[in-house]
């Protein structure tokens, strides 16, 4: 009764699939998830506590291998993550599967910019949320994030991007963020 299956009839790939899912989400609060990650038992409760006073939250993650054996206690420590709009723009270092947010975030986030190579769902949602909404970091690992070769969004493939690509990527996102400022929703 509460589970609905929606077929993505548009573009395919992980970013368009997340966009399709978000367009069809009906709840007041939205939690992103990857198919192979494990939520900690207190994830929903911890996020909802923060969402009482924030519109967007991102938590830390325990990094595990494909057999669920711990590799690192903190994704954010491993990546040297810093929260906030400018820090996010300079160095994208959060996992979309650690996001939870109020529905109103979608009013600025959707539709996603069309160039999915230059705009992944998690980076776009983090930028929109930290630019336009009250956002917070939860310093607790609320998921067990599996890191192995089969990840669809493995950070390893972005490690070899040129500096020119990284500048182009950020300018593309800034251009679309400015567009969201100019459009009344």
Predicted feature residues:
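Conserved nucleotide-sugar donor-binding catalytic segment
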Residues: 23, 84-156
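The conserved acidic donor/metal-binding loop of glycosyltransferases
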Residues: 34-38, 60
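Short aromatic/hydrophobic "clamp" motif used to bind/position activated sugar donors
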Residues: 30
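Catalytic core of nucleotide-sugar-dependent glycosyltransferases
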Residues: 78-88, 144-149, 154-185
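Acidic donor-binding segment of Leloir-type glycosyltransferases
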Residues: 1-6
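Glycine-rich, basic loop-to-helix element that forms the pyrophosphate-binding segment
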Residues: 8-25
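Acceptor/aglycone-binding surface of glycosyltransferases and processive sugar-polymer synthases
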Residues: 65-96
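Conserved donor NDP-sugar-binding/catalytic core segment of glycosyltransferases
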Residues: 44-71
């Amino acid at each position: 009764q509460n589970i609905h299956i929606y077929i993505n009839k548009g573009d395919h790939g992980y970013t368009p699939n997340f966009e399709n899912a978000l367009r069809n989400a009906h709840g007041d609060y939205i939690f992103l998830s990857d198919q192979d990650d494990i939520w900690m038992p207190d994830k929903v409760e911890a996020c909802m506590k923060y969402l009482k006073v924030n519109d967007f939250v991102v938590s830390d993650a325990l990094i595990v291998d494909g057999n669920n054996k711990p590799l690192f206690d903190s994704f954010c420590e491993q990546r040297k993550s810093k929260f906030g709009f400018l820090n996010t723009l300079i160095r994208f270092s959060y996992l979309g599967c650690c996001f939870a947010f109020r529905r109103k975030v979608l009013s600025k986030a959707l539709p996603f910019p069309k160039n999915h190579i230059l705009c992944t769902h998690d980076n776009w949602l983090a930028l929109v949320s930290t630019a336009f909404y009250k956002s917070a970091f939860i310093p607790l690992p609320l998921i067990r994030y599996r890191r192995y070769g089969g990840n669809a969004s493995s950070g390893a493939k972005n490690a070899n991007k040129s500096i020119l690509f990284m500048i182009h990527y950020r300018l593309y996102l800034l251009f679309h963020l400015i567009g969201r400022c100019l459009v009344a929703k």
